[in-house]
Amino acid sequence: MLEKVKHIILVLSGKGGVGKSTVSTQLALTLSESKFKVGLLDIDLCGPSVPYLLGLEGHDVHQCEEGWVPVYTNADKNLAVMSIGFLLKNRTDAVIWRGPKKTAMIKQFLEDVAWEDLDYLIIDTPPGTSDEHITVMECLKAVNADGAIIVTTPQEMALEDVRKEVTFCKKTGINIIGIVENMSGFVCPNCTECTNIFSSGGGVALAELAKVPHLGTLPIDPRVGALAGSGKACVKELPDCTTSKILQSIADNISAEKS
């Protein structure tokens, strides 16, 4: 049911634990705060975290004639969400599936969700380059997705995996919108000064090397972390923090390019 979607953006990461799902959810919330109609599709079948991050755990999806009806975050229906997390009885249930079953589920997510008219569909993918990614790329060929945002941390180990992600995108013909460097520095919750507790600048260097845009550098900010599970937009709750400014900049750049 992607014919009602104007723009499709994938969010990728080379490895787990880099904050990809947090970036996906906050980007979706940022776009919805800008009065766009947004969908967020969580295809991380083995680790669906979007329902938790948006405070939607316990919500159910139901069927209509057109397919699955997504869960909406509010009565305005500015943000619609679909995740396998809504289909599991318990959050701790493990999804132990082989490739063909995963492929079938992802195809169903891409073809059988009854999205209303959307300006943007953000697709939160699993880490790495697996069967799920290949299935998504094949399904999106017909609708010409806008591209992918790649999330990394500045450490060399994460950067090595992101290099593979960049190669994967180029080989599959997916446009790279840009790279986001996450968890770069720590913001003191008292004085808000940012200190580099690990290495920094790796995402910037990789973007230059791969000749793709660097979209921004996000620090570790306890105030932003406290929003997890609330479904609240960082740009609304913490408008002056660095993370909000970067997220708004990414959303503005995306909407400016597509207008």
Swiss-Prot record:
One of its GO terms (cellular component) is cytosol. GO terms for molecular function: 4 iron, 4 sulfur cluster binding; ATP binding; ATP-dependent FeS chaperone activity; metal ion binding. It is found in: Cytoplasm. Keywords: 4Fe-4S, ATP-binding, Cytoplasm, Iron, Iron-sulfur, Metal-binding, Nucleotide-binding. Its main location: cytoplasm. GO terms for biological process: iron-sulfur cluster assembly. PROSITE patterns: MRP. Binds 4 [4Fe-4S] clusters per heterotetramer. Contains two stable clusters in the N-termini of Nubp1 and two labile, bridging clusters between subunits of the Nubp1-Nubp2 heterotetramer. ATP binds at G14, K15, G16, G17, V18, G19, K20, S21. [4Fe-4S] cluster binds at C188, C191. Its cofactor is [4Fe-4S] cluster. It holds the Pfam family ParA. Component of the cytosolic iron-sulfur (Fe/S) protein assembly (CIA) machinery. Required for maturation of extramitochondrial Fe-S proteins. The Nubp1-Nubp2 heterotetramer forms a Fe-S scaffold complex, mediating the de novo assembly of an Fe-S cluster and its transfer to target apoproteins. Heterotetramer of 2 Nubp1 and 2 Nubp2 chains. Belongs to the Mrp/NBP35 ATP-binding proteins family. NUBP2/CFD1 subfamily. This is Cytosolic Fe-S cluster assembly factor Nubp2 homolog.
